[in-house]
From Swiss-Prot:
Organism in which the protein naturally occurs: Aspergillus clavatus (strain ATCC 1007 / CBS 513.65 / DSM 816 / NCTC 3887 / NRRL 1 / QM 1276 / 107)
Protein name: Nuclear protein localization protein 4
UniProt superkingdom: Eukaryota
Major subcellular site: cytoplasm
Membrane topology of the entry: Peripheral membrane protein
Chain's gene name: npl4
A single BP term in Gene Ontology: protein transport
Key words of the record: Cytoplasm, Endoplasmic reticulum, Membrane, mRNA transport, Nucleus, Protein transport, Translocation, Transport
Length: 674
């Protein structure tokens, strides 16, 4: 009889815990109805699974329907054992009024206030998960620059001190031994305000993985996570119905960030800034553009990184005197693809904040200074969202990523009334606080507001942890302050340096094509502009340098005249022979971008002999934009030598002289086609 005594089994699901009194000889499928009575009403019965560990953690999960003919005693369950229950909700299921009322009563905010029954909880888990990566140092693929800096020693070499060093030229002592890249005295001497990312990483790695402990390696970096974890193993209902100390974030203590992901922003040419300023000079409105370039090593800072800007693309926007409103950018992926073919990537954003001083000497009003702000709370939130879109992958982080290399630059006036560039990044904490919806911009630009749980404007319940920061009080003592309702934006900001190269060597040398989305000031991109830039040149040697223009490349990409297949056929026998000897079939658009960035005449000769180039010339001719006619030769003049073999005129067929009226008609025809 002892064998038939009922036993107690414990069950745990994400909806809570419950117990069932069962017989050891009872079959598992007979438990379905008892289990359903303790689960929500919209559970799909066929989706119930049982496991010896929490669902999703690698336990032995079995479907309840698949345990047909299996009794409880056969799997070795004893009195008091615990099983974990997984299930899925029925799609399109309706909740009964009684359950809806009970659920509404259970929804409470942290301050005890009930969530109104009419409020629909629309909170969804964020797309950015806090899940860790197993062995990130083996599976995460970093950028080549990060791999290069990881291999460097990073030590700061010092010469032999003639006064303090008593050893020979091959010896070493405390006064001349190399310093670590994060040495505070060296940074203070060189007036380096922030550590570089790789210097900071080595600093915390020395504290995390000590050689004398002989312990297994642990990634030293960990991204802050200020959101409620929805994979809590405690078994309670997910937030906002339930919360515990395991899934709720800790209090946030803000402090200035001691490192920066990028140390310097270098603009390859002053023309990049002047072209952006031209819009403000002509319209009086502000302008925004995205920076395309590369990341390179910055030798002025130990293990430093700099962003080298080669082009600025201006997306669709509405420009006003006091700000910019961005519109949907439909061809963003196409522009990114053109940049990728040129060896570039999106490295940052730049915008103007200028107001003429009215003196007539070109001076502007100084808005941003130590007594006002350097980057407003709205701009910090904007920069944080962009940095969240472009995370940095690194093998030194538990999640496989840490921070972002995306930079934010501002063109504004300084104390002397001159236009200057300022470069910033939002801190890692700022990005996470914006992502977690903890803060919001304020009408006062120098402070950031902390969200309130009672704010129902977003139609969702929030978890707002406590936020603190430290400041010097009236007694000259550093005291901790509560950040609610607002706190200074300086805690969310990191400053960068900027500059221009000593010898300008821009990637794009002929940036004269009209800039995109400037119709409001009478500048537009059309076939006439392409013809003026390309077809007007009679010699191919003059045409090849003209394609070195990022805005022209983006416009030609939109025309889809260059093939993206690996089949380049040539038209003439001579050209086919030259191409066979010089090149193999390849992507025409990739060749176009390579010519624009390498400025190689040999590659340019291959380009003008491709079908895509011939198609472009034909389009320009048919639209009324023909190349100028060859001048008529005087019989008394000596004959001109033939051009080099393999070169041909841009025109694919000879032209006969036309009257001025016919030429004018052709131009009107071209205008009607646009």
């Amino acid at each position: 009889m002892a064998a038939t005594r009922p036993i107690i089994l414990r069950f745990e699901s994400r909806n809570g815990q419950f117990r069932l009194s069962v017989s050891p000889q009872e079959l598992f499928p007979t438990l379905k109805q008892k289990i359903l009575e303790n689960l929500p009403k919209d559970v799909e019965p066929s989706s119930i699974t049982l496991s010896n560990k929490p669902i999703g953690t690698g336990g032995e999960e079995r479907s309840l329907d698949g345990l047909e003919g299996v009794s409880i005693e056969q799997v070795g369950l004893k009195h008091g054992d615990k099983l974990f229950v997984g299930y899925q909700e029925r799609k399109g299921g309706e909740t009964t009024p009684a359950k809806a009322h009970a659920a509404a009563d259970s929804l409470r905010r942290l301050n005890g206030a009930l969530v109104p029954q009419t409020e629909t909880v629309t909170f969804r888990p964020p797309t950015s998960s806090s899940a860790t990566v197993k062995n990130p140092w083996e599976v995460v693929q970093q950028s080549p620059l990060d791999d290069k800096l990881d291999k460097k020693d990073g030590k700061i070499q010092r010469p032999r001190d003639m006064k303090m060093c008593k050893h020979g030229p091959k010896g070493m002592c405390d006064y001349c031994m190399p310093l670590e890249p994060y040495d505070p005295k060296y940074l203070a001497e060189k007036k380096i305000k922030h550590l570089s990312f790789h210097s900071y990483m080595r600093k915390i790695n020395a504290a995390t993985n000590k050689a004398e402990l002989k312990s297994s390696f642990m990634p030293p970096l960990s991204e802050p996570y200020y959101r409620v974890r929805h994979d809590c193993p405690s078994g309670h209902p997910p937030w906002p119905e339930g919360i515990c100390t395991k899934c709720q974030p800790s209090a946030i203590s803000l402090q200035p960030q001691e490192f920066r992901m990028v140390d310097h922003v270098e603009f390859s040419s002053p023309d990049l800034i002047n072209s952006l300023l031209d819009f403000w000079r002509k319209s009086g409105s502000q302008r925004l553009g995205f920076l395309y370039g590369t990341y390179e090593e910055y030798t002025e800072v130990p293990l430093g990184v700099k962003a080298v800007v080669q082009a600025i693309y201006e997306p669709p926007q509405v420009d006003e005197v006091d700000g910019v409103t961005l519109h949907e950018w439909p061809n963003e992926k196409e522009v990114d693809e053109v940049a990728r073919l040129c060896g570039l990537e999106k490295v940052g954003v730049i915008f103007t904040d200028l107001l003429d001083a009215g003196r007539g000497d070109g001076s502007v009003v100084c808005k941003r200074h130590i007594d006002s702000y350097y980057l407003s709370s709205l701009e910090i939130a904007f920069a944080s969202r962009l940095q969240a879109q472009y995370p940095k992958t690194t093998k030194w982080s538990r999640t496989g990523r840490f921070g972002s290399n995306f930079v934010t630059c501002v063109l504004s006036g300084d104390e002397e009334g001159a236009i200057t560039i300022s470069s910033y990044q939002a801190s890692v904490s700022a990005v996470e606080m914006v992502r977690a919806d903890i803060v919001e911009p304020s009408a006062e630009p120098s402070v950031m507001l902390v969200q309130s749980e009672d704010d129902d404007s977003d139609n969702k319940s929030r978890y707002i942890p406590e936020v603190f920061y430290r400041k010097i009080n009236e007694y000259g003592v550093s005291a901790q302050q509560n950040a609610k309702p607002s706190f200074p934006v300086e805690f969310l900001l990191v400053t960068l340096t900027h500059g221009f190269p000593t010898e300008s060597n821009p990637l794009f040398t002929k940036s004269t094509f009209p800039i995109e989305n400037r119709e409001v000031i009478g500048e537009s991109q059309d076939l006439r502009s392409v013809a003026k830039k390309l077809v007007s040149h009679r010699d191919s040697n003059e045409v090849i340098p003209e394609v070195s223009d990022f805005h022209l490349l983006c416009y030609l990409h939109s025309l889809s005249t260059f093939s993206k297949t690996n089949a380049n056929r040539l038209h003439s026998k001579i050209t086919r022979t030259v191409t066979t000897n010089l090149m193999t079939p390849q992507d025409e658009e990739k060749l176009l971008c390579r010519v624009a960035t390498s400025h190689d005449p040999t590659e340019g000769l291959k380009l003008i002999n491709t079908p895509g180039w011939a198609t472009l010339v034909t389009i320009l001719q048919e639209s009324g934009e023909r190349p100028p006619k060859r001048p008529w030769l005087n019989p008394a003049d000596p004959p001109r030598p033939l051009s080099q073999q393999g070169k041909r005129h841009l025109s694919s067929r000879p032209e006969s002289p036309k009257s001025e009226s016919e030429q004018l008609a052709k131009r009107f025809k071209g205008a009607s086609l646009e």
